[in-house]
C-alpha cells in the first residue's frame, strides 16, 4: 500500500471516533495525520524505534520528540545495564513531559515492568503473543509483576548472572 493511501486509511479510521491518541513515527514530517488528529481532539505521540541499539544522540532525539508532539515515545534496544541506565536518565531530562520509554528485547523487559518508575505514562503488553521483541503479556504485567502498582518509590533490586530470566529470585 502506498504511503498516501495508508495515511488516508488511518485518517478515515480516526474519524470513526473512539481514539485518544495516534502514534506518528518521527521521520514523518508535519503531516495531515497530525492535523486530523488535533482537529478530532486526539493527542499525537511522536515516536522513534531503533531495533539495533540505543542511539548515541538519544537525549537530543527525545527533546526533539517532546517539542514536536503531545507525547514523546522512544522504543530502543538496550544491550547492557549502561543502556538501561541511559533510559532511566531520560526521565530526569524530561521530568514533566508526557512520555513513553520502552526497551525492546530481553534487556528491555525491566523497562516494561518499571514503566511508572521511568516516568512513562503507559507500557505495552500483548494478549499472550509478543508482537515486539521483549514484549510481556498484559496478564504477566498485571498479575506476575504488578507493574500497575509500582511507582517512583519502588526500590529496585537485581539478580546478577547470565542468564537470569529463568530465576525465581
Give the positions of each predicted feature.
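Glycine/small-residue-rich loop that forms an oxyanion/phosphate-binding "nest" at active or ligand-binding sites
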Residues: 1-32
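Catalytic alpha/beta core domains of metabolic enzymes, predominantly
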Residues: 27-156
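An N-terminal-biased, well-structured beta-alpha scaffold segment characteristic
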Residues: 158, 162-169
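A generic secondary-structure micro-motif detector
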Residues: 22-23, 101, 163
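Alpha-helix initiation/capping motif
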Residues: 2, 25, 151-154, 169
Amino acid at each position: 500500500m502506498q504511503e498516501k493511501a495508508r495515511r488516508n486509511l488511518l485518517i478515515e479510521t480516526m474519524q470513526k471516533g473512539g481514539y485518544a491518541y495516534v502514534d506518528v513515527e518521527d521521520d514523518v514530517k508535519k503531516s495531515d495525520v497530525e492535523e486530523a488528529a488535533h482537529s478530532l481532539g486526539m493527542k499525537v505521540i511522536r515516536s522513534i524505534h531503533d531495533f539495533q541499539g540505543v542511539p548515541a544522540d538519544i537525549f537530543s532525539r527525545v527533546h526533539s520528540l517532546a517539542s514536536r508532539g503531545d507525547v514523546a515515545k522512544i522504543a530502543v534496544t538496550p544491550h547492557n545495564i549502561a543502556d538501561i541506565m541511559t533510559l532511566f536518565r531520560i526521565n530526569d531530562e524530561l521530568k514533566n513531559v508526557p512520555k513513553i520509554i520502552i526497551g525492546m528485547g530481553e534487556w528491555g523487559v525491566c523497562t516494561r515492568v518499571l514503566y511508572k518508575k521511568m516516568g512513562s505514562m503507559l507500557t505495552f503488553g500483548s494478549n499472550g503473543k509478543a508482537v515486539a521483541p521483549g514484549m510481556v503479556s498484559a496478564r504477566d504485567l498485571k498479575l506476575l509483576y504488578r507493574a500497575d502498582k509500582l511507582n517512583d518509590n519502588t526500590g529496585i533490586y537485581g539478580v546478577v548472572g547470565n542468564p537470569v530470566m529463568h530465576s525465581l529470585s
